[in-house]
Amino acid sequence: MDETDSQITCADSSVDKLSHLKRNEVKSCPLPELHGADEMLPELNKSCLTNPDILRYSRQLVLPDLGVQGQLKLSKASVLVIGCGGLGCPVAQYLAASGIGRLGLLDYDVVEMSNLHRQVLHGENRLGMSKSVSVAKTLRKLNSAVVYLPYHISLNPENALQIIQQYDIIADCSDNVPTRYLVNDTCVLAGKPLVSASALRWEGQLTVYNYHQGPCYRCLFPKPPPSETVTNCADGGVLGIVPGIIGSLQALEVLKIASGMAPSYSGVLLMFDALEGRFRNIKIRGKKNDCAACSNPSETAILQDYEAFCGSSASDKCRMLRLLSRDERLSVEEYKRLLDDHVPHILMDVRPQPEVDICRLPHSIHIPLKGLEEKNEKWVSFLRTKIAELITAGNRTEKTVITICKLGNDSQIAVKILQDLFGKEDLFIAKDVQGGLMAWAENIDPMFPRY
């Protein structure tokens, strides 16, 4: 430490604290007020490292590529983490531990039990608490010298610029397409580097947008994908450690930029496959001269309706499709009455096998949606056999098939396929259960597992 000490020109026995917060404590209410475009956050003017700083950061201070000057840059940097979930938790944790000066934590959501396997800064005692406040509360116990600003709000075209322009670096840890476009366009307008990551199932991706002359998100994706092809963690699942790994690498990119080093993934996409244990770097195309966002930032349509543009909600919650008419759907209450009245029918569970293994209604048959979409002869033949058994057992000619899934999305798709396969047959009726098995658990059987 002698070499490091010789570089320190001054020392202070105290560490910086937030004036409105006690040490190692965060208030859950009230939340910080949003600052307008003309009410900029105060500049972080730290001129030297304190003795407590030297002790706390000593293991990274001795790194030649960082050193005292790099640590000072970190202490004067402000980072906004958008999304305090599976990615945002490791990002915020390592940024706080490394000594970032100010950390904005933005999330509209509250902590739920299904978050805890991957969102490791929350806990069972935080259920129902604002995620941004929960993260700030945990991190203040880790490093009270960092300024934490939790925002319990949804980012939208009306508030995005006034928030983002007050930070040096933006970490996009969101889980929906409209927010990614909104954050990208706002970063272009504000001239901020954007460190963006995603994680789904066993895979993760990471890249840096809008850094120097590098591309932005719209350069790569001028148009959003069809909403029905987009899968998030709630729909597709994710192994908890995958966002932990990608989020840690995301924090590393932020730290490099904040300390004055060049990021590794500007113009490069990192792809991680947890099943194979493999990392791959893919060079991505450069900045587009005709990009709608970064070719002329002053004309970027920051106030556009991003949900309409993407055809999906700016939320990581499961989307709700509306493919069927009301007459083609049954509420869980209506289906319960149908059961109680012993109306002959086939209940077809169209979820993937791993979900069926979690829970199922005992009288249902299982035909996965994928098998129907592919018109797999095995599954079509199986269904025809069950329909024949229904007619024989009930001494009826009416063929009623009711589809069910987790939330009532795939079941609607299944009805459309059934109508295509069997719709021309006499007395064939296909309907789905609105809200699926989770609505059944919510409104009919509280002991039915929720996932």
Swiss-Prot record:
Domain spans labelled Rhodanese: 341-449
GO molecular function, one term: molybdopterin-synthase sulfurtransferase activity
Known catalytic reactions: [molybdopterin-synthase sulfur-carrier protein]-C-terminal Gly-Gly + ATP + H(+) = [molybdopterin-synthase sulfur-carrier protein]-C-terminal Gly-Gly-AMP + diphosphate; [molybdopterin-synthase sulfur-carrier protein]-C-terminal Gly-Gly-AMP + S-sulfanyl-L-cysteinyl-[cysteine desulfurase] + AH2 = [molybdopterin-synthase sulfur-carrier protein]-C-terminal-Gly-aminoethanethioate + L-cysteinyl-[cysteine desulfurase] + A + AMP + 2 H(+)
Pfam families in alphabetical order: Rhodanese, ThiF
PROSITE patterns linked: RHODANESE_3
Enzyme class: transferase
Identification of the protein by name: Adenylyltransferase and sulfurtransferase MOCS3
Originating species: Xenopus laevis (African clawed frog)
